[in-house]
Amino acid sequence: GRMITPTDLPALTPDITTLYFGGISLCNIPAADTYLALAERETSKCVIMLDPNIRPGFITDEAAYRTRLSAIFAVADIIKVSDEDLEWLIPGTADIMSKLAQLQAGRQAVMILTCGKDGARALLPDGTDVAVSVPPAVVVDTVGAGDTFNAGVLAHLHSEQSLTKAAIRQLRGAHMTKALEFGAKVAAVTVARAGANPPWRHEISDA
């Protein structure tokens, strides 16, 4: 909940290897500062994925929010933004991949960009740029699509023994392409259903 504080945080057990942060949980204190503290506390041990999923209507203090995002960007291993997120983070006329590279600058992070029906791209730590298209889908409800995409990417990396801090820094284009494709595939199932209703793995072909 939004009232969680650092004293509420438990010690993480060794089997927890990845933490995912995002959405409106980063907008309001004390929860937002608590989640930032957790990311900073665990960054040496866990893979950190961030999807800010920026919702300007929920932001009550833009300066503080931008500062908080910068701090969690600094400890994240995988940063996923939408084209709309990126335009909010880096306003201006530069092309979208230049903005993604600007956001990545100085970090050893995998940057993922989702562009709705135009697919998804990733910029790897070595500068490799990969892109995938979105599989055909009958859109019923887009609620949960982004979270499902992110879960699919993480699940695929985990299945390939690539969900470690060292492995992420050494990801190759072919491996990232497969992860993006799996994320897009599971998200396509979610949008074809009413509500936030992601698929089970056995529902996904070639999983």
Question: Where in the sequence are the language-model features?
Answer:
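Ribokinase/PfkB-type carbohydrate-kinase core domain
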Residues: G1-V130, S162, I204
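Conserved phosphate-binding/catalytic region of the ribokinase-like
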Residues: G92-A207
